[in-house]
């Protein structure tokens, strides 16, 4: 928000949140209310309490029921769930173009977020590093890197300190990518131990 407040062309900030975990809904609402009160620009928000993947299946697959002009965003920020799904899970079936075998929900979120971006829109995601190699993620990598240009990567070297209160034991990264076919000459890479 601080950066958006500095841009004179931005008159209004429109935030859409997808969250279907009732355990965090009260905290999310409090944070959105705080943001609304403490920003220099007009901020409007909407919380969609639905499945992020399944709510957009028709648009993603361009079916007969798809919206002719689905909503696209300038910025998408994501901290998706790290859950392995069965290969016949509804989310996996909805995004077969990026799935090979039993997918992890986090990369389906990333693929859907790339779909949700306007041209030159940017996304920032915190995810496991595992998507960067191996045959299991090849379809996702090919589609994602065909549509998006990585701009910055931050690696957490610790496997257990990124989410101290959770049982996530993976190498984790934050990446920033832009929806464009222009590739940057350099990608900024940084690391931290914790």
Language-model segments: residues:
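Conserved beta-strand positions in the Rossmann-like core of class I SAM-dependent methyltransferases
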Residues: 16
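Short, conserved SAM-binding/catalytic segment
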Residues: 28-43
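Signature of N6-adenine DNA methyltransferases within the class I
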Residues: 1, 10-12, 20-26, 50-194
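Conserved SAM-binding strand-loop segment of SAM-dependent methyltransferases
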Residues: 40-52
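Short, flexible coil/linker elements and helix-boundary hinge sites characteristic
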Residues: 5-8, 39-42, 65-66
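A general structural signal for alpha-helical elements within enzymatic catalytic domains
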Residues: 5-6, 33-37, 145
């Amino acid at each position: 928000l601080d950066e958006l407040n500095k841009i004179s062309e931005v008159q209004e900030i429109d935030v859409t949140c997808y969250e279907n975990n009732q355990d965090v809904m009260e905290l999310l609402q409090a944070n959105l209310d705080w943001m609304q009160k403490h920003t220099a620009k007009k901020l409007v928000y909407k919380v969609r309490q639905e499945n992020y993947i399944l709510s957009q299946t028709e648009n993603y697959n361009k079916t007969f029921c798809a919206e002719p002009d689905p909503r696209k965003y300038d910025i998408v920020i994501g901290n998706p769930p790290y859950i392995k799904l069965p290969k016949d899970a509804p989310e996996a079936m909805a995004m077969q173009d990026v799935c090979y075998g039993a997918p992890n929900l986090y990369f389906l979120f990333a693929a859907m977020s790339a779909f949700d971006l306007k041209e030159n829109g940017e996304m920032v995601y915190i995810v496991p590093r595992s998507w960067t190699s191996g045959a299991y993620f090849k379809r996702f990598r090919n589609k994602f890197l065909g549509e998006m240009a990585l701009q910055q990567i931050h690696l957490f070297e610790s496997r257990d300190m990124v989410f101290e209160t959770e049982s996530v034991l993976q190498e984790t990264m934050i990446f920033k990518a832009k929806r464009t076919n222009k590739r940057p000459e350099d990608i900024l890479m940084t690391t931290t131990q914790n």
